[in-house]
């Protein structure tokens, strides 16, 4: 039985929804300007105030334009294109006083832009997977160009009963992903639910938001899920082959070390098939029971195997989870 959740992490009450204004602060000295990207839109009026007690002889520059662009403690600009974004700096007598960095968040025909990330085949931008029910999971996303990118992923629910999650720093994976004959870079991040109870029924989903920055562009993406819906076990381990009569062999395996315990409660089922020579095993998202595979609910079975490999993959026994990758062992039967 799991202890009752008595405390609420500050991370659970972060409100990601933008205030009802054209400009809001993302972090210190960095602001997001929400811009209507339709051609006839007038742009957004933004006031920038120099952080100084000084009042006179203040000038402004922008890293997007040459020379002095304004004077006075407050600079009023119209933001309607990326040339209007970037860093604005106020000066006095050759001394830098303060600066503000503007990022653009584009909206066209009522839809926020989603240009930084590439969606996966199932039309989602964020793909999350958990190897067990511990509350630990990994989320990944794809980008076409790895240039001047920054990411921040966090809990997006404002409910006091929400499931608090802490995520690490996003990192670039060595894995390249090919979609529609184009190669994409893959980023991933590890997350952990702050308070977990693997045996409890999930009633509220985990809600996450990813903030993405590329040069002077800002976008955000969201996802929600139950841990049970993103389960993908690791492959079975320690596959062993025992020759029997003729071409018959007994293949055995063990649960992956990462899988939840006790196994009597968190049970796996397995799919077994023969991999012929030069045949490639396909990993599918839709289900485990591929053509030629058969179901095994224990950790051994007998098969006829005269060449190639015996391959095994795992799936949650009681819930239609994703399948593990295949684990294979050569037949190596005696002639």
Curated annotation (Swiss-Prot):
What the entry lists under CDD domains is as follows: FN3 (cd00063)
Task: List the glycosylation sites.
Answer: 47, 122, 132, 220
Q: Name one Pfam family in it.
A: IL12p40_C
Q: What is the effect of changing residue 294 to L?
A: In strain: B10.S/J and SJL/J
Q: Name one GO cellular component term.
A: cell surface
Question: Which cysteines form disulfides?
Answer: 50-90
What's the main place this protein lives? secreted
Question: What function does this protein fulfil?
Answer: Cytokine that can act as a growth factor for activated T and NK cells, enhance the lytic activity of NK/lymphokine-activated killer cells, and stimulate the production of IFN-gamma by resting PBMC.
Instruction: Write the protein's name.
Output: Interleukin-12 subunit beta
Q: Which organism is it from?
A: Mus musculus (Mouse)
């Amino acid at each position: 039985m799991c202890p009752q959740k008595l405390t609420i992490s500050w991370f659970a009450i972060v409100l990601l929804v933008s205030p009802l204004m054209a400009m809001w602060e993302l972090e210190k000295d960095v602001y997001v300007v929400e811009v209507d990207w339709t051609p006839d839109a007038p742009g957004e009026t933004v006031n920038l105030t120099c952080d100084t007690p000084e009042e006179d002889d203040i000038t402004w520059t922008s890293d997007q334009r040459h020379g002095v662009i304004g004077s006075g403690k407050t600079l009023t600009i119209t933001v309607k294109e990326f040339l209007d974004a970037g860093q604005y700096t106020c000066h006095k007598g050759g001394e830098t006083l303060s600066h503000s960095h503007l990022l653009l968040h584009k909206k066209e025909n009522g839809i926020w832009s989603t240009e930084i990330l590439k969606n996966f085949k199932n039309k989602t931008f964020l793909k999350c997977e958990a190897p067990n029910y511990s509350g630990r999971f990994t989320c990944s996303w794809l980008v076409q160009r790895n240039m001047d990118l920054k990411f921040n992923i966090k809990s997006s629910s404002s409910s006091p009963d929400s499931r608090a999650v802490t995520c690490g720093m996003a990192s670039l994976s060595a894995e390249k992903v090919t979609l529609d004959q184009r190669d994409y870079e893959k980023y991933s991040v590890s997350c952990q639910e702050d308070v977990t109870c693997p045996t409890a029924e999930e009633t509220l989903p985990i809600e996450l938001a990813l903030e993405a920055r590329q040069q002077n562009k800002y976008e955000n993406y969201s996802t929600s899920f139950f841990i049970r819906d993103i389960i993908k076990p690791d492959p079975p381990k320690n596959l062993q082959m025992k020759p029997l009569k003729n071409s018959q062999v007994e293949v055995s395996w063990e649960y992956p070390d990462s899988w939840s315990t006790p196994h009597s409660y968190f049970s796996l089922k397995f799919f077994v098939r023969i991999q012929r020579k030069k045949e490639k095993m396909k990993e599918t998202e839709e289900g485990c029971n591929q053509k030629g595979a058969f179901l095994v609910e224990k950790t051994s079975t007998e098969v006829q195997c005269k060449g190639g490999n015996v391959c095994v993959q795992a799936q949650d026994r009681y819930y239609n989870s994703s399948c593990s990758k295949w684990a294979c062992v050569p037949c190596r039967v005696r002639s």
